[in-house]
Amino acid sequence: GAVRDIKLPPGALQKLADVEPRLVGQTFDLPPVDPGLNSRVAGVLTGSMDDYGLAVLDLSNPAAPRYAEHRADHKQNVGSVGKLVVALALFQALADLHPQDIEARRKLLKTTLVTADTFSQTDHHTVRMFDPASRTLTRRAVRIGDQATLYEWLDWMLSPSSNSVAGMVMREAMLLRHFGAAYPVPEAQIQQFFNSTP
């Protein structure tokens, strides 16, 4: 049976082999602002337009890229970029533990069950939680006690950009780095580690 949810666009369903990076080996200077594209971008940002700095590079025609910007000089700390660093830290810890064994890395991601604790608090971003028994899909913020695989925590951090989930993934990267081959460790050992680590 199918679960009711938002249907993914066709491009999101393509396999990696179908992705063709068309700009490999090409270089170009950033084109001047395209007035038509700029006004279309401005139309999307109505209401909260001045809360954002935005740049759009339209590569639908690689021979003639188009550029639009809004508040180009606006400086802002983008939290989602930090989540990429958290993901990189976790993947590097996995690679250091299993340098030649990608399947061992995948196994840890698939089988490690992570339980939310105070590292997960608090956030307004919701995550998708699927209950296989009732076949229901809900969206809500993470709560202490929620359980999911490490793969799911990564997905929740990157897809809806959940800050609280990023805290949990940071926790797991630290635990993986500290405990190495003994990872994953029981909850009591996790609490003891963080209670005794300055």
Predicted regions and their residues:
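Beta-lactamase-like hydrolase cores
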Residues: I6-H74, L97
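Active-site-adjacent helix/loop patches that line small-molecule binding or acyl-intermediate pockets
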Residues: V19-V41, I102-P198
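Extracellular structured ligand-interaction cores
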Residues: M49-D51, D73-K75, G79-V81, L154, ...
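Acidic/polar N-terminal loop/beta-strand segments that form early-domain functional surfaces
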Residues: L57-L59, V81, D117-F119
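Short regulatory "switch" loops immediately downstream of catalytic or recognition motifs
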Residues: L57-S60, L90-P99, R171-F179
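Active-site SXXK
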Residues: N77-R105, V114
